Every structure is written in structure tokens, then in C-alpha cells.
């Protein structure tokens, strides 16, 4: 999954005054690994170093709580206090195994309206990717 994130990052012109990228990891909890306000990390080298560190240390395959990730994004990522730029469009791409936990809340309850204009969910399962886009607030 991290290699898919790395490939996606490679497609953008990343920088403090260009495309900014935030990384949130999640399982039974969600954690912001890079925020928009961390300008020193808004370059491909720094983001790739983060991915290398995650690959070496993080475990995949735990509980999937996509709702917690969306809630964290709404509360901690797409905020001006954390570096969100009001005049730039907000796009969120969620990498998931496609099966959020049965106790997950509906996405429309955890992601405030109009925080993001486009959500794309990339479901990776058995090394096959399937891209599904849906309007903000709708569950896949």
C-alpha cells in the first residue's frame, strides 16, 4: 500500500507554495503523520523518507476504522490552524483494504460538510487496485 502512496506522490509538484500533502495513518486509531503546516516536509524527499520509516516500523493488517481517519482529517488536517489554505481545493484520497470495521460511524457523521470537495477511495486487495470516487459525505 505504501508503494501506491509513493507512486501517487511522485505525480504531484509538491512544495510549500505548490501541492501540499498530509498523511494520516489509521487502524483502531488515526494519527496525522504529516500536516500541511509542516512546510519542511512538503517535498518529495521528506515524504518518501516518511514512507520508508513507516514501511520499516508500521504494521499493516489491523482493524480498519476509516471513520476515525475521516474524523481526524476533518478535525486536524483540513483546518487553517494546521496549514490548510482556504483558496486551494481540498482533495482527499483514502487508501484502504475496503472493509471498514462494523462499529464504524457513517462517513457523513464524521467528516464535516464542505471540508473536501472530492474524495477518492483506492481499495487495494490481493494486489489489485480499484478506484472509486464518491461525493464528500457519502459512504462508498
Protein language model features and the residues they cover:
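A generic alpha-helix structural signal
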Residues: 2-5, 51, 111
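Von Willebrand factor
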Residues: 1-95, 100-105, 124, 128
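Loop/turn elements at helix/coil->beta-strand transitions in domains of secreted/extracellular proteins
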Residues: 16-20, 87-91, 115-122
